[in-house]
Structures are given as C-alpha cells and as structure tokens.
C-alpha cells in the first residue's frame, strides 16, 4: 500500500517523511481508544528488525503526530468519515 487516503481537514500543518523513532506512538485505523507503540504494531505483524529500522512515517509537522505508517496503516484520527469534506491522497514511491 504505497498510498493513503486521509481527511485533509484533520491536518494541522504540512506532511513530512522521516524514519520511525524509538517511542513513536499512533492509533491504528479502527482502534478507537488509546495508542500503540509503532514498534509493537510492527512486531505484531511479524516485520523484521531490518524492515522496522527503515520504516517511514508521514507526520503532521504542527502536531508531530504520525499520520501514516508508509505502506502499512493510517492513524485513526485522520481516517475518512461520513463528515469528511476533502480527501487527501498521499503517495510514496
């Protein structure tokens, strides 16, 4: 999954790509309460240590929150809902 669709109006700033960092947390799509460590999320999905170290995340530069684990999952906060007015498609090649 090299693209993600998000609710554009939930972004506070611009998007920036960076590698995952120790302690990064996000709320996986469909998880309505709490957050999960990105490292735990990747371990649960049997991602190798090598692939974990090169995992990219798209972050909101204003809030510093993870919007998308590139190629894997969007954060639940940025999901498209019935009240979404504008959809942003993010592509990473």
Model-assigned labels for residue ranges:
Residues 1-93:
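Basic, glycine-rich polyanion-binding accessory segments appended to enzymes
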């Amino acid at each position: 999954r090299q693209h993600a669709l998000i609710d554009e109006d939930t972004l506070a700033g611009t998007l920036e790509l960076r590698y995952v960092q120790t302690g990064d947390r996000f709320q996986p799509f469909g998880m309505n309460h709490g957050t999960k460590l990105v490292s735990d999320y990747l371990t649960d999905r049997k991602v190798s240590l090598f692939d974990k170290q090169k995992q990219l995340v798209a972050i909101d530069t204003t809030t510093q929150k993870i919007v998308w684990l590139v190629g894997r999952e969007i954060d639940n906060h940025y999901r498209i809902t019935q009240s979404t007015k504008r959809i942003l498609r993010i592509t990473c090649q």
